[in-house]
Structure formats: C-alpha cells, structure tokens
C-alpha cells in the first residue's frame, strides 16, 4: 500500500458516507444532468458526488485510492439501493504506466472534485461520450487563507482548468480568485462544466 493510500485510509476511517457532500459545481448545476446514463466519480472519497449522481438516476462508477472509502461507499450504496459500483485504484500509478484503464467514450457524466493529477486529464476527456458532461472543481494557486493542499503542484494556475478543456463546449466556468470582496463568492477554487462535442 502506498503512503498516499495509507494517508487517505486514515482520513476516511472515522468518517461516514452519510456525511459526504457533493461538490458545489454538481449541486448548483444538477439541472444539466441527463436523466439516465453512465457517470464516473473520480477520486470519489466517501462518495458525495456518486450518491448525488445515483439519486439523479445515473449508473455510477466510483473510483478512489482509499480502500476504506470504497468499502464504506459500497456498503452504503447497497443499503440505500443506489446503483454505484466502487473500485479502489491508484490511477496516478496506472497513468505513469500508460494504462489508466479509462475506456474511451465510456461515460455520459464525469465528476471530479478536489483532485488534480494533470497527466490523467487527456484520458479523462477521452472517456466522455459525445455530448457527455465534465463537472470539475478543484483548488487554485490564488487563495485566501489555508484551505486546500499546501503543495502548489495540486493547485490550478489561473485559467488552467479552461485550457485543459480546450475543444469542449464550456457551459460554465468560475474562478473568482482575489477579485472584489474576498469575504464573499467562490474562493480558492475553480469550476468548469464542459461538454464534449
């Protein structure tokens, strides 16, 4: 087991799926979701996004590095009769081996929140079906306070998320940065909803 897997297993040991929250980009824009189809919740954790997607009628695949999180989510999904398939995978290691295992044209919806591994992004976009939607939200370099990862490699540069979505139709983009009254607004993060042509 990798150090990263151990770290996340420790974090999820004391937490429960019932407390898992879906990301802002998803909850505020659920009206864009298809009524059925396949969805991927990448870096799922305890499955806030996966649970939200399944309750919206989608067949969900949840992938995370933490076996603890995936076990808890699998049990919760079964108890709640939600269509969520859980898989514990180290996608970063798989991407380094050039075999991330994300099939092309596999998903109608892909949701990623609070996770960034740049080498995986091209495969992620190819995994979208035509007209498929990407909901992505994660931390930015510009921040107020100390929220998010301390390692800047896990934070987006200004407009970086937009650049990664080049060739997709942008339905929504938000990155408030340090503009205006920093006590209000969507701070420390960027979000995008993009559709594959």
State the predicted function of each range.
Residues 1-34, 36-45:
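Conserved class I S-adenosyl-L-methionine
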Residues 46-58:
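Conserved SAM-binding loop of SAM-dependent methyltransferases across substrates and taxa
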Residues 59-64:
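Conserved SAM-binding motif I beta-strand of class I
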Residues 66-68:
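Conserved SAM/SAH-binding beta-strand->alpha-helix loop
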Residues 80-94:
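Conserved SAM-binding strand-loop segment of SAM-dependent methyltransferases
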Residues 97-108:
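A short acidic, Gly/Pro-enriched loop at the edge of an enzyme's catalytic core
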Residues 132-139:
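Conserved beta-strand signature within the Rossmann-like core of class I S-adenosyl-L-methionine
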């Amino acid at each position: 087991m990798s150090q990263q897997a151990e770290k996340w297993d420790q974090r999820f040991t004391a937490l429960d799926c019932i407390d898992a929250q879906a990301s802002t980009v998803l909850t505020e824009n659920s009206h864009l979701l298809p009524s059925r189809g396949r969805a991927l919740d990448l870096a799922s954790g305890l499955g806030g996004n996966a649970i939200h997607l399944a309750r919206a009628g989608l067949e969900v695949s949840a992938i995370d590095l933490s076996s603890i999180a995936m076990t808890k989510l699998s049990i919760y999904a079964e108890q709640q009769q939600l269509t969520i398939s859980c898989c514990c995978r180290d996608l970063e290691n798989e991407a380094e081996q050039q075999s991330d295992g994300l099939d092309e044209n596999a998903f109608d919806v892909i949701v990623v929140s609070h996770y960034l591994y740049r080498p995986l992004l091209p495969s992620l976009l190819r995994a979208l079906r035509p007209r498929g939607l990407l909901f992505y939200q994660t931390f930015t370099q510009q921040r107020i306070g100390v929220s998010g990862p301390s390692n800047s490699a896990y934070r987006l540069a200004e407009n970086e998320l937009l650049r990664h979505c080049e060739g997709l139709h942008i339905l929504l983009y938000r990155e408030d940065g340090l503009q205006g009254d920093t006590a209000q607004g969507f701070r420390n993060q960027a979000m995008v909803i993009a559709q594959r042509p």
